[in-house]
Amino acid sequence: MKLIFAVFKPFKLDEVREALTEIGITGMTVTEVKGFGRQKGHTELYRGAEYVVDFLPKVQIMAACPDGLIDIATETIRNAAHTGKIGDGKIFVMPLEEVVRIRTGETG
């Protein structure tokens, strides 16, 4: 089992969620986050004054994924979140040792 963290542009969330549902990944945690990579933010004009926006709004999803689905899951996220522009995001894949369902204590 693996844990996928993906960070991408917020307007792509529905597209990513629907694409993952189609391949059988139906549960995920979604968090609104801010960050920057190579693009280092941008400059905006507000009431006549320029200021630098260092952190850009992003969405982060976290989903448990069976080992056999990891390649298709990362490809699915990549295709659904892709715009071709700077700041499209990143996908991180990590080993997942154990999951415990709080309600029942079930592990797996």
Question: Residue spans of the language-model regions?
Answer:
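Positively charged, small/polar-rich N-terminal and surface patches that mediate targeting and assembly
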Residues: 1-108
